[in-house]
């Protein structure tokens, strides 16, 4: 297994195709449409053009794509932070401790820029991801609540 920086010409299709799976894991009623993929493609191309603001790292198993992590540098009223936006592993690579490797790549990207805080959002029902993030030292700082209005 090897983690390396994203190479647009080599990795674009694999990372883009993983978007549908990633969203289905987190949003069970999600339907992957051409419009969704077009939007994600635009985001991915834009991120690749700003390598100091976006770290995208690919996990390879030999020549096979196994997953990736996407972290962005952001700023709000509390200061600058690393936002771990996406962590994805193909199904056959899950529950093998590889998420920790991807998180390490994200954290390294952030700390090399002198930033001392990383944040992320996780869907409450994605308990595998919640456990990974808790093991990595993340703690709940805010709760987002929702009420369907009929």
Segments from the language model and where they lie:
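Conserved active-site alpha-helix within GNAT-family acetyltransferase domains
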Residues: 100, 124-142
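Conserved GNAT-fold acetyl-CoA-binding loop/helix
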Residues: 23-45
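A short helix-loop-beta-strand connector motif used in the catalytic cores of GNAT acetyltransferases and
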Residues: 45-58
